[in-house]
Curated annotation (Swiss-Prot):
Pathway: Carbohydrate biosynthesis; gluconeogenesis; Carbohydrate degradation; glycolysis; D-glyceraldehyde 3-phosphate from glycerone phosphate: step 1/1. This is Triosephosphate isomerase. Substrate binds at residues 9-11, 173, 212, 233-234. It catalyses: D-glyceraldehyde 3-phosphate = dihydroxyacetone phosphate. Involved in the gluconeogenesis. Catalyzes stereospecifically the conversion of dihydroxyacetone phosphate (DHAP) to D-glyceraldehyde-3-phosphate (G3P). The lineage of its organism: Bacteria, Pseudomonadati, Pseudomonadota, Gammaproteobacteria, Enterobacterales. Keywords: Cytoplasm, Gluconeogenesis, Glycolysis, Isomerase. Belongs to the triosephosphate isomerase family. GO terms for cellular component: cytosol. It is an enzyme of class 5 (isomerase). The gene is tpiA. Homodimer.
Length: 255
């Protein structure tokens, strides 16, 4: 039985006041909600503050990136050991914005995946196709390639306890979203692709949907059998909007 996870990716947003106010709002909005895991990934500057603000709540701490190195002369980077030390659990890797703006390759992302696993942290591996790739009918090819960077080097066992986030690049922050049927088809493909190596592991992998998820489309998305929650961008910056998505995930999986 997979439990859904809804994770908020705050991206490059926030300040000290916002961290306190947003988390206070989440604590209120999510009171009594169960059946769905919740995590937030603030900017690294605010991880310590967020950790204290979520203390005693069901909200887990995440982060938006990690370096492949654990220490050394790597200016500006943050290591898996540092993230673990500060209390982060879910670490986003491979986000399309990192792939685009920082030219992160599939191989580099696979190395980050391995470092997180070795450190005992949970990778949230983002995969997904661009609009051009989607229009060219290459969605499955792209997703398979991005998964295979890990699968072919670390094996199916590496996906135990891991989160995959399918984020069609054309839907991120655009207001566009894949239809529930479109998203389900890709999620099923991802699960089936891993199942070729190990069906048991594939059955328990959490596969989130990301790409303009909001309180209006969440329930229909989460009703799909292979959609296990969401990686949420803009809507995660508002307590009521984010909580509505969490509640939709919890309700859908109880139905």
């Amino acid at each position: 039985m997979r439990h859904p996870l809804v994770m908020g990716n705050w991206k490059l947003n926030g300040n000290k006041q916002m961290v306190n106010e947003l988390i206070a709002g989440l604590r209120t909005e999510l009171s009594g909600v169960d059946g769905c895991g919740v995590a937030i990934a603030p900017p690294v500057m605010y991880l310590e503050q967020a950790k204290h603000a979520i203390s005693g709540s069901p909200v887990a701490l995440g982060a938006q990136n990690v370096d492949v190195n654990l220490s050394g002369a790597f200016t500006g980077e943050v290591s898996a050991d540092m993230l673990k030390d500060i209390g982060a659990q879910y670490i986003i890797i491979g986000h399309s914005e990192r792939r685009t703006w920082h030219a992160e390759s599939d191989d580099a992302i696979a190395k980050k995946f391995a470092v997180l696993k070795q450190t005992g942290l949970i990778p949230v591996l983002c995969i997904g196709e661009t609009e051009a790739e989607n229009e060219a009918g290459k969605t499955e090819e792209v997703c398979a390639r991005q998964i295979d960077a890990v699968l072919n080097t670390q094996g199916a066992d590496a996906f135990k306890g891991v989160v995959i986030a399918y984020e069609p690049v054309w839907a991120i922050g655009t207001g566009k979203s894949a239809t529930p049927a479109q998203a389900q088809a890709v999620h099923k493909f991802i699960r089936d692709h891993i199942a070729k190596k190990d069906a048991t592991v594939a059955a328990q992998v959490i596969i989130q949907y990301g790409g303009s998820v909001n309180d209006k489309n969440a329930a229909e998305l989460f009703a799909q059998p292979d959609i296990d929650g969401a990686l949420v961008g803009g809507a995660s910056l508002k307590a009521d909007a984010f909580a509505a998505i969490v509640k939709a995930a919890a309700a859908a999986k109880k139905a």
